[in-house]
Amino acid sequence: MEIYLMQHGPSLPKEQDPDEGLSPEGEERIHTSGRALKKMGIDFDAILASTKKRSRQTAAIIAQEVGFSPAKIIETERVKAMTPPEETVKALAEMPGYTKVLIAGHLPSLAEVASFLLTEGSKAKVEFERGGCCRIDVEELPTHSGRLRWYLTPEQLQLIAS
C-alpha cells in the first residue's frame, strides 16, 4: 500500500472562524499541492479526512485537483489530531484492496503515524509542514518497516506545480 500523509493547510483563527477552516492562503497552498501531485501522476483509491473542517477542506481540494470524486472521501475520527497511531494504522489495515490512500490529517497524529510505520516506537521524527506531503510504502499492516519514499515541503510542491 502507498500511504500518503498530508497535514491540512493553514487555517483561520478561531475568532474569525469558530470551526477553524482553511484560510485563503491555506486553500491556495492545498490547491498548489494538489496540482503538484497530479503533475507527478499520483492518484488515490481512497482519501481519509477527520471530521474537522480544515481536514475535510484539504481532502476535498486534493480530490478536486487529482480527479478523485469528493463524494468518496471517507470522514473518520480515526485520523484526528490526538488519535493514537495504532488506531489510524488499524483503520488502514481494514481497507483491503486499496493500494493508494491519502490521509488529510493533523499533528501530532500524522507524525506519529509516520513514525509508527517506519520504526518501532516513536524514534523516527518525521516533521510535517501544512500542505506538505509524504509517501510511505508498506507491504502489510500493521508494520514498523515501511519505506519512506519521499517527503515534499509546500515550497517543493509549488515548484513542481509551476
Residue ranges and their predicted role:
Residues 94, 98-102, 107-132:
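Non-DNA-binding regulatory cores of transcription-related proteins
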Residues 12, 82, 110, 142, ...:
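Flexible, glycine-rich phosphate/dinucleotide-binding loops
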Residues 36, 61, 65, 94, ...:
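Active-site catalytic microenvironments for nucleophilic, acid-base chemistry
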Residues 154-162:
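Acidic, His/Gly-rich catalytic cores of divalent-metal-dependent hydrolytic chemistry
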Residues 68-70, 98, 143:
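Short, well-ordered coil/turn elements that cap or connect secondary structure elements
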Residues 2-79, 83-86, 90, 124-130, ...:
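Active-site-proximal alpha-helix that buttresses catalytic centers in soluble enzyme cores
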Residues 91-102, 146-154:
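A polyampholytic, Gly/Pro-enriched intrinsically disordered region
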Residues 118-147, 153-154:
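Domain-level recognition of soluble alpha/beta enzyme cores
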